[in-house]
From Swiss-Prot:
SUPFAM superfamilies assigned to the protein according to its UniProt record, in alphabetical order: Tetrahydrobiopterin biosynthesis enzymes-like
The protein's enzyme class: oxidoreductase
Signal peptide: none
NCBIfam families, per database record: QueF
Identification of the protein by name: NADPH-dependent 7-cyano-7-deazaguanine reductase
Protein origin, superkingdom: Bacteria
Biological processes annotated in GO: queuosine biosynthetic process; tRNA modification
UniProt subunit comment: Homodimer.
Protein family (similarity comment): Belongs to the GTP cyclohydrolase I family. QueF type 2 subfamily.
Gene3D superfamilies in alphabetical order: 3.30.1130.10
Main location: cytoplasm
Length: 281
């Protein structure tokens, strides 16, 4: 159980509670979760964050009415800066997007600007918003994380409780730069405990990390309850703490739920994330 499971900010969320669905625009549906909630137990504060990054959201169920009342659809891509005060709670984001369904907007740019304004206000940070017509993204190939996949190792695992100590002593003597990938990342929603399925890419330069130890560590998230963004920051923090690489990037892409997927990345070096969807997205 996370140390902040009973944080007062969580009690105020609609997540896990019966909810009415509103189809007319309502910015108040958005709900924020303070990033400090999980960062402070890790010793992370705004003036000493060891990373930069963003939470990339893909919006697959976005619709509104044009000035003639004709429904419009688009796919949205949101990038929320990791130094924002808050993250956006995903169920509230879904409810907020549903409120566009029967609302008239003059054009797609008006929708984009509304999203950017409201999300920035809720997160108290920088947000970029792009909206794509379907013919702009139709036919795009399925992407794949570059790197060596950890998942084919012939190892026996019988514990699925989170344990950062798997990384204790995992840093070897050889100095390398490598990208490691696992599709076995699975954690659970902090509130509902519904499963969150993801793939993760870890790129680092420094003492070589034992691949078996790293896979055991990632699998130990299987019963762990945290939001996507928090899991990625925990992975970054634990690898830095135990393995002390010179550079590190952690990027996870999660399967969609409620028409949204969340794809957080954190890095202490130059990094440009791929934004194409993976096979399970």
């Amino acid at each position: 159980m996370s140390s902040y499971q009973n944080h007062k900010a969580l009690a105020e969320l609609t997540l896990g509670k019966p909810t009415a669905y509103c189809d007319h625009y309502d910015a108040t549906l958005l709900q924020a979760v303070p990033r400090s909630m999980n960062r402070e137990p890790l010793g992370l504060y705004p003036d000493n964050l060891p990373f930069h990054g963003a939470d990339i959201w893909t919006l697959y169920e976005l619709s509104w009415l044009n000035s003639n009342g004709l429904p419009q659809v688009a796919v949205g891509e949101i990038s929320l800066n990791a130094d924002s005060i808050n993250l956006i709670e995903s169920k509230s984001f879904k409810l907020y997007l549903n409120s566009f369904n029967q609302t008239i907007f003059a054009d797609k740019e008006s929708v984009r600007m509304t999203l950017q304004r409201d999300l920035a206000a809720c997160a108290q940070g920088n947000v970029s918003v792009a909206l794509y017509d379907l013919d702009e993204i139709t036919g795009q190939p399925i992407s794949n994380f570059n790197g060596e996949c950890l998942d084919k190792q012939d190892i026996r695992i019988d514990s699925y409780e989170f344990n950062a100590d798997y990384l204790q002593g995992a840093a070897g003597k050889d100095h390398v730069e490598e990208s490691l990938v696992s599709h076995l990342l699975k954690s659970n929603c902090l509130i509902t405990h519904q499963p969150d399925w993801g793939s993760v890419q870890i790129h680092y330069r420094g003492p070589q990390i034992d691949h078996e130890a790293l896979l055991r560590y990632l699998v130990s998230f299987r019963h762990h309850n945290e939001f996507h963004e928090q899991c990625v920051e925990r992975i970054f923090n634990d690898i830095m703490r135990f393995c002390q690489p010179e550079t590190l990037t952690v990027y996870a892409r999660y399967t969609r739920r409620g028409g949204l997927d969340i794809n957080p990345w954190r890095s202490n070096t130059d990094f440009v994330p791929l934004t194409g969807r993976l096979a399970r997205q």
